[in-house]
Regions:
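Repeat-solenoid scaffold signature
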Residues: 255-291
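Flexible "stalk/tail and boundary" regions
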Residues: 239, 373-374, 415, 422-442
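Acidic, Gly/Ser/Thr-rich repeat motifs that build Ca2+-stabilized beta-propeller blades
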Residues: 24-210, 269-272, 278-285, 336-375, ...
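Conserved blade-ending motifs and adjacent loop-strand segments that build the rim/top face
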Residues: 264, 377-399
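N-terminal signal peptide c-region/cleavage motif recognized by signal peptidases
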Residues: 18-20
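Surface-exposed loop and turn segments in beta-propeller and other repeat-based domains
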Residues: 113-126, 174-190, 230, 239-260, ...
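Beta-propeller blade signature
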Residues: 159-169, 222-240, 295-296, 419-425
C-alpha cells in the first residue's frame, strides 16, 4: 500500500544575479563551527516534518501555488545512494551502502537483494556506491557498480568499478574493470558517481579521500592537484575500463591516462544537458563552498588551492578562496552549505514548470531547481521538499516523466534503515483544494 503527501514546490521568481552578489560573507576565521545558529535554523526550520510524515496525508501549499504529491514506494533502505531504471520502465535497481543491490518492480521492493555482487569494504562511508546501465543494456545486460575495496593485510581502501550482467535478480560475468589509485583511510569519501556520456564513454568521479576534515592538514587532499593520482578527479574510460586514445592526459607519461578533469573535492552529481550537450557536475564542499561546474576535458577546478568553503575546524580551506590563474571558477556556488548530491536535467511533461531545469538533490534536506541559460549563467529557481526533513541522495526521471528521489536520515550508521524511495507526482489545483477540504487545517509551508 502506498501513502501520499502533497507538498509544494517553492518556486521563487527567476532573477539574474552576478556571482559577486550571490556570494555570502565568510565567517571570521577560528570559530568553533562554520555554521551560525541562524544558518542551522534555516537548514532545519522549526515546523519541518520528519520523514515519517510521508505516512500521513498532509497538504502544504506554497506561495507560488505549485504542489507535488509525494508517494512512498519503499522504506527500510540502508543509506541508498544510486537508482536506475531498467528499459522496461517499471523496474528499478537501488544501491545500499551496506553492499546490497535492491530491486523495485511496479512500485514494490523485492525483499531479496540481487545476488552475485563483488566483495567490497564496508567501513565508515565505504560500501556499494552507485549503479549505471550500459547504453546497450537491452541487448548485452551489462551494468556497472562502484564500490570501496580494501587490500588487506595492507592498510587503506580505494574506489573500484565492476561490470556484470544482470539477469532476473542475479549478477553473472562479474569483472573488476577499474581499481583507482586512491588508497587512503576508509574515513575518506569515495565519490563513485558514474554516467555514460553521449560519446559512449563511462565517466566516474573519485573523491578527495580525505579522512581528516576536522583538521586543517591532510596528506590526501593535495593529491587532487596531482595527475599521478586518481584522487579528486573525473575519470573517462571505455565500457571495458580501458583508456580512450583522446583523453586529455593520455600522452603524459607521468599522468594517469584515465583522468578527464582534476582539482575536485567530491563530485556527487554528473549530468549532461540534452539541449546543449554540455557536461555539468555538482561538487560537495566541506562547510560551504559547494559548487556547480561546467566540466571540460583537461581543466583544473582548483581544489584545494581554491575553495570558498571551510574545514570543519572553522578555518578557511584556502588563503585565496576565489580565483587562481589556470583554474576554473565555479559557475555557481553555495555559502552556507547546500551539500549537492546527484542531479538531472528534467525533460518530462508531468511538471511543465520544471521542464529544462537542472534539479539538484541536497543532503541539506532540500532539492534545488536551477535554470541554465545558453551563456552558462545559472539562475536559482527555488527549492522544494525541505518540509520532509530528510537527506536527499539521488534523483532520477522515469521514462514516463515522474521524478524519483532516494532519501536517508543521517550520514553514518551501517545499521540505519531509515532510507526511502519516493515518487513525485503532479497535483492539479482542484485536487489540492479537495484534499485540503477533506483533511482540515494545513501546516504552512516554510519559505526558503
Amino acid at each position: 500500500m502506498t501513502r501520499t503527501v502533497c507538498l509544494p514546490i517553492a518556486v521563487a521568481a527567476l532573477a539574474c544575479i552576478p556571482l559577486a552578489t550571490i556570494a555570502q560573507p565568510l565567517d571570521t576565521p577560528g570559530v568553533t563551527s562554520p555554521l551560525t545558529a541562524a544558518q542551522i535554523a534555516r537548514e532545519n526550520p522549526p515546523n519541518a516534518l520528519t520523514g515519517a510524515a510521508v505516512d500521513k496525508p498532509v497538504v502544504l501549499k506554497s506561495a507560488g501555488g505549485v504542489s507535488v504529491r509525494v508517494v512512498k514506494l519503499a522504506e527500510g533502505l540502508s543509506h541508498p545512494d544510486g537508482l536506475v531504471f531498467l528499459p522496461d520502465g517499471h523496474t528499478m535497481l537501488i544501491t545500499e551502502r551496506a553492499g546490497r543491490l535492491r530491486v523495485v518492480k511496479d512500485g514494490m521492493l523485492d525483499p531479496t537483494p540481487v545476488s552475485g555482487l563483488p566483495d567490497m569494504d564496508h567501513v565508515e562511508l565505504g560500501g556499494l556506491q552507485n549503479v549505471v546501465l550500459h547504453p546497450d543494456f537491452a541487448k548485452n545486460h551489462f551494468l556497472y557498480l562502484s564500490y570501496s575495496k580494501n587490500r588487506l593485510p595492507q592498510l587503506g581502501t580505494t574506489l573500484a568499478v565492476a561490470r556484470a550482467r544482470y539477469d532476473q535478480g542475479r549478477l553473472t560475468d562479474v569483472k573488476e574493470i577499474l581499481v583507482t589509485e586512491a588508497w587512503e583511510s576508509p574515513l575518506g569519501t569515495y565519490g563513485g558517481r558514474m554516467i555514460f556520456g553521449p560519446d559512449g564513454m563511462l565517466y566516474i568521479s573519485v573523491g578527495d579521500r580525505d579522512g581528516t576534515t576536522h583538521n586543517d592538514v591532510s596528506s590526501a587532499r593535495p593529491q587532487a592537484q596531482s595527475l599521478a593520482s586518481h584522487i579528486g578527479k573525473i575519470l573517462r574510460v571505455r565500457d571495458d575500463g580501458s583508456i580512450p586514445a583522446d583523453n586529455p592526459f593520455v600522452k603524459d607519461a607521468k599522468a594517469k591516462g584515465e583522468i578527464y578533469s582534476y582539482g575536485h573535492r567530491n563530485v556527487y552529481g554528473i549530468a549532461w544537458d540534452p539541449k546543449t550537450g554540455k557536461m555539468w557536475t555538482s561538487e560537495f564542499g566541506p562547510a560551504g563552498g559547494d559548487e556547480i561546474n561546467r566540466e571540460l576535458p583537461g581543466h583544473n577546478y582548483g581544489w584545494p588551492l581554491v575553495s570558498l568553503g571551510r574545514n570543519y575546524s572553522g578555518h578557511l580551506v584556502s588563503d585565496q578562496p576565489w580565483h587562481r590563474d589556470g583554474m576554473d571558477d565555479p559557475v555557481y556556488f553555495w555559502n552556507p552549505t547546500f551539500n549537492p548530491e546527484n542531479m538531472i536535467f528534467y525533460t518530462g511533461d508531468k511538471f511543465p514548470r520544471l521542464k529544462g531545469s537542472l534539479l539538484v538533490a541536497g543532503a541539506t534536506k532540500k532539492i534545488a531547481q536551477m535554470v541554465i541559460r545558453d551563456d552558462d549563467f545559472i539562475m536559482m529557481g527555488g527549492t522544494m521538499l525541505q518540509e520532509l526533513n530528510v537527506r536527499f541522495r539521488d534523483i532520477a526521471q522515469s521514462p514516463d516523466g515522474y521524478i524519483y528521489v532516494l532519501t536517508e536520515g543521517r550520514l553514518r550508521g551501517p545499521k540505519d534503515t531509515d532510507g526511502m524511495l519516493l515518487r513525485l507526482e503532479p497535483v492539479a489545483a482542484s485536487a489540492v483544494a479537495s484534499e485540503r477540504d477533506n483533511r482540515g487545517a494545513l501546516s504552512p509551508a516554510t519559505p526558503d
